[in-house]
Amino acid sequence: MGNAKRATQNDEDYTFVSPVVKYLLFFFNMIFWIISLVLISIGVYSRIVKHETALACLTVDPALILMVVGILMFFITFCGCVGSLRENICLLQTFCIFLTIMFLLQLLAGVLGFVFSDKARGKVTDMFDNAIKHYRDDLDLQNLIDYGQKQFNCCGGISFMDWSKNMYFNCSDDNPSRERCSVPFSCCLHAKEETIINTMCGHGMQALNYLAASAFINTNGCIDILVNWIHSNLFLLGGIALGLTIPQLVGILLSQVLINQIQDQIKLQNYNQQHRSDPWS
């Protein structure tokens, strides 16, 4: 009789749910939950500090992107955290489904970007042209463009003449700006030993032909150089893309394993409950 009771007690204490899987999934989601709060905070801060039209030149406000990504990540990781901790199948399935959808959307975006590379290039060119037009409107945008032009040794989207699309650098005769026919200093060729940057080095460069201007500034556009850089660093970009997808695949795998374990545990509990009520069944 005593052995039968101990056997029944052991069956009730036994669990299919692995603590390793359960708490690994919990801490995995906790890390990304904290990251989501950081993204939301940065996005909200940027929206409050910046003027409404500060980054209107871009297709989508980066602060808004951060907020949307942060809120979406917060919801998904919340489902993962609570679902794993409380062993809630509904929340875990929600977590798994959203992660799967995100993974498939990223895969689809990569395929579409490769198939429609010409349209993607045209979209990037339009964005760069818009950024040029608003170069003086926002300091952060200005610093971003200057950093890109210095980093890639380029000037403008297609060529340095693109800077004529900016009202201050426009080369038309009726432009009263002191920067007429100029380009930003980030287009200039700087010697490595040069410690003081001449911010007026791009003055009047649009009035020169390509050959004459190339002695003072980078005349090649940033779009072609960016495309060449992407082609030269495909393995690096592929590694980054893989690094972004691995956590998602790990999350999907762990959540699915935990769901199966919880379902097995529920079956065991139902069996034990039925066995207690009818030991002869």
UniProtKB/Swiss-Prot annotation:
Intervals, Extracellular compartment: 45-62, 116-233
Residues carrying sugar: 170
Subcellular localization: Cell membrane; Cell junction, Adherens junction; Cytoplasm
Keyword Transmembrane on entry: yes
GO cellular component labels: adherens junction; cytoplasm; plasma membrane
Top-level division of the source organism's lineage: Eukaryota
Disulfide bond entries: 154-222, 155-187, 171-181, 188-201
Entry-linked SUPFAM superfamilies: Tetraspanin
Main location: membrane
Pfam families according to UniProt: Tetraspanin
Keywords: Cell junction, Cell membrane, Cytoplasm, Disulfide bond, Glycoprotein, Membrane, Transmembrane, Transmembrane helix
Protein family according to the UniProt entry: Belongs to the tetraspanin (TM4SF) family.
Described purpose of this protein according to its UniProt entry: Part of TspanC8 subgroup, composed of 6 members that interact with the transmembrane metalloprotease ADAM10. This interaction is required for ADAM10 exit from the endoplasmic reticulum and for enzymatic maturation and trafficking to the cell surface as well as substrate specificity. Different TspanC8/ADAM10 complexes have distinct substrates.
Subunit structure: Homodimer; disulfide-linked.
Name of the protein described by the UniProt record: Tetraspanin-33
The organism of origin for this protein: Danio rerio
Gene coding for it: tspan33
